Design a protein with these regions (language model features):
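PLP-dependent amino-acid enzyme catalytic core
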Residues: 1-447
Length: 447
């Protein structure tokens, strides 16, 4: 069975269940698999005939081993992935992978829904309960809240930066109630994420059975490898190499793709497209990593991350080490990274122009995050020449970002059914000022 180690070097190895329920390693590191299983080409060549949940089983089962019986895991996957995953051809072998058809219209649904089912399975097995503490820059909170909504033995606390989420993103978190507790933080996403990490490391809270549903949790990360295999099976059934362009904020999505690559997926290269928070593209150019503090406010708000947590995993994948503060302890193999990743930073101006161009040229509505990915792909094709097939990830429904889209295209994106009644529901959330001390006081008083 595959064991998981901490990126901060903690010696103890845990199985998938231990890593999933802990969320973060005791030394504040992130869990990474000690080895990555390689899927045979025979298995991968069978994927074009498989459904999404069948592909997911092949990709995820090696990490879980015998911890979940085959029928139970298949049922969870079928239940988690009951929605369509369309590939939209834009032009000449260039596709959009639409990851916005889940219940909260965001790619975060793919990871959150499976993780919720796995956590509930393990908790029921042991008769335990847990508190999920998670930070969001926009879409994670709603996906996690909906995935865990109403589940027994699990309470969910979501921290979000009050002034940096759209009204619809906020309403998706604050209109649920029951076991969901949203907290509006006076600050940025990085502040929310730092408070969550501090809570995990606080000995005073050790009795609370805290876990995370951010992409610091390995249970969020591994399901993200699946949609790369799925997309490849649909656009390159003959096994050709594919270019993937990935809008990148906290870098969980890119890590999912890199894990798929290391598991045997034929990939030409990944485009890591960030917004103006360009700490990673600068690192790829110079070899020096400097977090951006505070992060810059861009219209692709879910990617306003000045120090992406998953860089610790990315560095580990290439033989390096980074601690939770962003300090580089051991440099990764930069030449190997550059062979597999092309990193670009896309300005708000270019993002807006991309939204306009996609609509006028192709009648495609992109929201700001998907536009960053699409702009990154166009930059790649200009620099390295045409490549087919190429897939860019569209990570959220345009209806989540109506203001920019109406202003740029004149089109008011239609509300998907999952969001249609949001405006009528009552909101319920707490405002939290005062940094970590306020969060700690809240946790100790109410939980």
């Amino acid at each position: 069975m595959i064991k998981f180690f901490s990126t901060n070097g903690h010696q103890e190895r845990v199985d998938f269940k231990g890593a999933l329920l802990a969320g973060q390693a005791p030394d504040k590191g992130l869990y990474m698999p000690e080895s990555l299983p390689i899927l045979s080409q025979e298995i991968i060549q069978g994927f074009p005939q498989m459904s999404y949940h069948q592909i997911a089983y092949q990709v995820i089962k090696p990490y879980i081993g015998e911890l979940v019986a085959e029928p139970a895991l298949l049922d969870m996957l079928k239940d988690a992935y009951s929605f369509d995953v369309p590939l939209e051809r834009v032009y000449d072998g260039k596709y959009l992978l639409r990851l916005d058809r889940g219940p909260t219209c965001s790619f975060k649904d793919f990871a959150a829904r499976l993780m919720a089912r796995l956590m509930q399975y393990f908790l029921k097995e042991e008769g335990k309960s847990i508190i999920i503490l998670t930070a969001t820059s926009g879409d994670t909170g709603s996906a996690v809240a909906h995935a865990f909504y109403g589940l027994e033995n699990i309470r969910v606390i979501v921290l979000f930066p009050e002034k940096e989420v759209t009204e619809r993103q906020r309403r998706q978190m604050t209109t649920l109630g029951k076991n969901i507790y949203p907290l509006a933080v006076a600050g940025k996403f990085d502040d929310c994420q730092a408070q969550v990490k501090q809570a995990f490391a606080d000995p005073d809270l050790a009795g609370l059975a805290l876990s995370s549903a951010n992409s610091i949790n390995i249970g969020r990360l591994l399901p993200q490898a699946v949609y790369y295999f799925y997309a490849h099976s649909r656009v390159a059934p003959g096994g050709e190499k594919v270019v993937f362009s990935v809008p990148s904020g906290n870098f969980g999505d890119l890590m999912g793709g890199l894990i798929a690559l290391k598991m045997g997926l034929p990939v030409k290269q990944f485009v890591a497209a960030t917004n103006e928070n360009d700490e990673f593209p600068l690192f790829m150019q110079t070899g020096r990593y400097e977090p951006i503090q505070p992060s810059k406010n861009c219209i692709s708000n879910a990617m306003n991350v000045g120090h992406p947590s998953n860089l610790a995993r990315l560095f580990a994948l290439y033989g390096g080490q980074m601690d939770e503060s962003g300090r580089v302890i051991r440099q990764p193999e930069l030449s190997a990274m550059r062979e597999e990743i092309y990193a670009v930073s896309i300005s708000d101006e270019e993002t807006r122009q991309t939204i306009k161009d996609a609509y006028t040229r192709h009648m495609v509505l992109l929201e700001p995050h998907g536009a960053v990915g699409w702009a990154g792909l166009q930059r790649y094709l200009r620099e390295f020449g045409d490549w087919n097939p190429a897939v860019s990830l569209e990570t959220a429904d345009p209806a989540k970002f109506p203001d920019e889209i109406v202003r740029l295209t004149g089109i008011n994106p239609p509300l998907p059914p999952a969001m249609a009644s949001l405006d009528e529901k009552e909101e319920n959330y707490l405002r939290m000022a005062g940094g970590y001390a306020s969060l700690k006081e809240y946790l100790m008083e109410f939980f």
